[in-house]
From Swiss-Prot:
Residues 25-110, 173-196 are cytoplasmic. Required for the post-translational delivery of tail-anchored (TA) proteins to the endoplasmic reticulum. Acts as a membrane receptor for soluble get3, which recognizes and selectively binds the transmembrane domain of TA proteins in the cytosol. The lineage of its organism: Eukaryota, Fungi, Dikarya, Ascomycota, Pezizomycotina. Residues 43-100 form a coiled coil. It is found in: Endoplasmic reticulum membrane. GO terms for cellular component: endoplasmic reticulum membrane; GET complex. HAMAP family: Get1. Interacts with get3. This is Protein get1.
Length: 196
């Protein structure tokens, strides 16, 4: 099992990745993956896209047919189009309700697996030292701050380690991003031309 040091560190890496990628992006990706599974929801989504294509084809055919010259054909296309649109709207309502329920479930699972786990670890290990500091290395008042609120004196508390990990992850990510952007930017090359 991972030690408490690494558990908290990897938790903050996961929180940073979720915050950087964006919750809505992750939700959309999970929804698309969910629609690939063999469920009734994915069947409804396929049926909805089929009905949408059919409605667009019927609308195109209606626009290509003259309502005055070929009224019978146009009226038949209009009835089929209206029926297809009604079916499409019913499926769309169903899928919208299922997607909102799915988004709510994913949001709860994401919160529980990131921030909820962080709060749980802070509560559960509040009296447990993450690691001990060497004797007489630092003054008493600094030891008190590092062990705040409930860890034994001379150790680092979970709360302080959480703050250190969050700061370290965000600063490291900023450094890596700036180095990547600096190396990815093309350097201007001066070209000299001879003048005569």
């Amino acid at each position: 099992m991972l030690s408490l040091i690494w558990t908290i560190f990897f938790l903050h890496v996961a929180i940073y990745v979720v915050n950087t990628a964006g919750a809505s992006t992750i939700d959309s990706l999970l929804w698309l993956l969910y629609l690939k599974l063999p469920t009734s929801t994915s069947k409804n989504a396929r049926e909805q896209s089929r009905l949408k294509r059919e409605a667009l084809e019927l609308k195109r055919d209606m626009n290509n047919t003259s309502s005055q010259d070929e009224f019978a054909k146009w009226a038949k296309l209009r009835r089929r189009h209206d029926k297809t649109m009604d079916e499409y709207e019913q499926l769309n309502k169903t899928l919208t309700a299922q997607k909102s329920s799915f988004d709510w479930s994913v949001k709860i699972a994401r919160w529980l697996s990131t921030n909820g786990l962080k709060i749980f670890l802070q509560f559960w290990y509040s009296k447990t030292p993450v690691f001990a500091l060497p004797e007489a290395w630092i003054p008493y008042y600094v030891q008190w701050i590092l062990s705040f609120p409930r860890a034994p004196m001379g150790s680092v508390s979970v709360h302080v380690w959480n703050s250190v990990c969050a700061t370290a992850v965000s600063v490291t990510a900023e450094m890596v991003t700036s180095m990547f952007l600096q190396t990815a930017r093309p350097t201007p090359v001066a070209t000299a031309q001879k003048t005569q």
